[in-house]
Every structure is written in structure tokens, then in C-alpha cells.
């Protein structure tokens, strides 16, 4: 397997995708190393991600996975790159407007090449600057509702659905979420001490509350055992590029079968975090703070409302007849 670097990536592109439009001078940058600024530094934490561009507006993202994660000590199978390419292909057939275009899938070298969407901005950093995204709730909800419904058994033939779940079992990466989200919470890492001893003790008092432990293990079991659809798995504000009218979703390597509600809950948790940050960081006027926090809170409600709206639209159009004619089934999904 070739390991891509800034020095050899152009020869790799010329050999594998000679039709890709690039004209000298060509610039190669590595995402995640601070080469491009925070507005486009969305990926590159676990993988090697390059931006290759020229001065005439052609720009591409080249992503390679290796066994050893870029910024973590643990090892994961590099075939996650192939799974990500395959799920992007599938989701591009469902919601092409929200998925970057794909130009190459190379499973031998665990590489794929896709559209550079950095003409948009990562919403995490823009929210830190108090930016509003008027279409985020509607577009984000449509992306989730469509990709969830059309990879569920409500739509797919049962055999095809089971094959899809088996193919995207993703045994190694799902453990990252099963443990990282439900077990390794605040107070379990030495970095938490940076917040100060009083805050650390306060958080530990919550973490070790018996009822909380009971509830999170219940949720973990539900997450592990209820495979309703192929989730994104890592749908948060650093994996969504947007502007006032467009949205693109990246970093889909964590896809596997799980409950419908997980992705929606994950992005809502991120927005709650943004609202907490906005409640305490400096604003030029207190009314601006209140307005921005109110916007973030309303975003949570709108995401859920639009998700249900779109999901029900797809249900009415394409759900299997046996589900459609079962009185109350559709409505029960929103409870």
C-alpha cells in the first residue's frame, strides 16, 4: 500500500485519475495540520486528508486511512476508508445535494477522492462566531430523514436490508461510539482536571449518580441492539459544511446499523453545547447573546420538527404497504 504524502500525491492522482482537472501551479495542503485555517479543518483527526488545488478553481480532497490513527495512539482497520466511500456512494443516490461528489475509490490503497466543499464553512466554527444558518434545520433534517428512511426496513426489501446491515457491520468503529459516547464521559480522563478541581468534582457527582449510570447503560444497550437504519454515526457540527443556502455532510466512516434517533440526538447535543458556550462567552451586547441563544434553542425544535415532517413524507410515498395500512404505526414513530 502506498502511503500518500505532500510530495507523492500529485503523481498518485496522475496515475489513478488522469482525467481530474488540475493545472499548474498546484498547491497541496494537509487538513488537520493548520495549513488551511479553522474554517476548513473539519477532518484529519484520524485520517490523512489532503486538499489539492490550482489557481483556476479546481480543488479536490484526497482522504487516506491507515491502521494507525493520525492523532491517536490506537489502531483501527484502514478498510474504514472503503466503507466510507461506499456509504457516500449510497447516500449520494438518496440526497445528492448534501453529499460531496466522488471521483475515485481505491480500496487497495485505502484512498478516495472527493469534491472540495470548502467554499462552504464548518458550522462549528461559524457558530462560535455567532453566525446564523437559515436553512440548517431544514437541510440537516432532510439529510437525516432521507438517509435513514431509505436505508431502513420500512422501505428496503427485508433481505436487502439485512445484507446492508451485515455489510456495514463496522465492528471496530462502532465500538468507538458504544464506549466513547456512553462510557468515557466527563471525569474518566485526566484532561478533565484542566477545568479545575471544584468543577471536576461537581461533574463526577453527576457522572456517578446511580440513576444516571442506570439510564446510560440502558441507552447503550438500546444503541447496540436496535438496528433500525444505517446512521451517519458522527453527525456533529464539525462534519457539516454550510452557508446560507447550501449544506454538505462529510466524515461518514462511522456508519452502521443503529436507532433512528441517534444521529438527531448527536447533533442536538452539539447544539446544546453551542448554546451553553454562547451563554457565557463575550458578546458586544446582552441582547445579541439572548437572541443567539434563542436561535440555537429554536434550531433544536426545528431539527426535530423537520425530521418528522420529511420522514413522514417519505413514508407516505415509499413505505411498504403492510406498514402504511397499519393504523397508528407511522404516528408511533414520532413518540
For the regions a protein language model found, what residue spans apply to each?
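Active-site acidic catalytic loop and adjacent metal/ATP-binding pocket
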Residues: 38-54, 60-62, 216-262
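Conserved ATP-binding subdomain of kinase catalytic cores across diverse folds
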Residues: 59, 65-69, 73-167
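Conserved protein kinase catalytic core
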Residues: 69, 121-122, 240, 257-259, ...
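Short helix/strand-bridging catalytic loops that position acidic/His residues to coordinate divalent metals
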Residues: 71-73, 123-133, 249-256, 284-291
Amino acid at each position: 500500500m502506498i502511503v500518500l504524502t505532500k510530495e507523492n500525491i500529485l503523481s498518485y492522482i496522475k496515475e489513478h485519475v488522469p482525467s481530474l482537472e488540475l493545472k499548474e501551479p498546484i498547491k497541496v495542503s494537509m487538513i488537520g495540520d493548520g495549513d488551511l485555517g479553522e474554517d476548513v479543518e473539519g477532518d484529519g483527526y484520524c485520517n490523512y486528508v489532503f486538499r489539492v488545488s490550482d489557481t483556476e478553481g479546481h480543488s479536490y480532497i484526497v482522504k487516506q486511512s491507515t491502521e494507525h490513527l493520525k492523532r491517536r495512539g490506537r489502531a483501527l482497520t484502514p478498510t474504514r476508508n472503503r466503507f466510507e466511500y461506499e456509504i457516500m456512494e449510497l447516500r449520494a443516490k438518496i440526497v445528492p445535494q448534501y453529499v460531496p461528489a466522488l471521483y475515485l475509490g481505491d480500496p487497495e490503497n485505502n484512498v478516495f477522492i472527493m469534491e472540495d466543499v470548502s467554499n462552504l464553512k464548518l458550522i462549528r466554527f461559524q457558530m462560535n462566531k455567532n453566525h446564523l444558518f437559515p436553512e440548517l434545520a431544514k437541510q440537516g433534517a432532510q439529510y437525516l430523514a432521507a438517509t435513514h428512511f431509505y436505508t431502513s426496513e420500512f422501505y428496503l426489501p427485508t433481505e436487502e436490508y439485512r445484507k446492508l446491515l451485515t455489510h456495514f457491520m463496522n465492528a471496530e468503529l462502532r465500538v468507538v461510539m458504544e464506549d466513547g459516547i456512553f462510557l468515557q464521559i466527563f471525569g474518566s480522563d485526566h484532561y478533565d482536571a484542566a477545568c479545575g478541581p471544584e468543577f471536576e468534582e461537581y461533574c463526577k457527582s453527576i457522572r456517578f449518580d446511580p440513576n444516571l449510570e442506570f439510564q446510560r447503560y440502558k441507552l447503550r444497550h438500546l444503541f447496540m441492539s436496535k438496528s433500525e437504519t444505517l446512521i451517519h454515526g458522527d453527525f456533529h457540527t464539525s462534519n457539516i459544511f454550510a452557508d446560507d443556502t447550501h449544506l454538505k455532510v462529510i466524515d461518514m466512516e462511522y456508519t452502521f446499523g443503529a436507532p433512528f434517533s441517534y444521529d438527531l440526538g448527536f447533533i442536538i447535543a452539539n447544539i446544546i453545547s453551542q448554546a451553553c458556550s454562547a451563554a457565557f462567552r463575550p458578546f458586544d451586547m446582552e441582547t445579541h447573546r439572548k437572541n443567539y441563544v434563542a436561535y440555537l434553542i429554536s434550531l433544536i425544535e426545528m431539527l426535530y420538527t423537520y425530521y418528522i415532517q420529511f420522514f413522514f413524507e417519505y413514508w407516505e410515498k415509499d413505505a411498504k404497504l403492510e406498514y402504511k395500512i397499519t393504523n397508528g404505526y407511522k404516528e408511533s414513530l414520532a413518540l
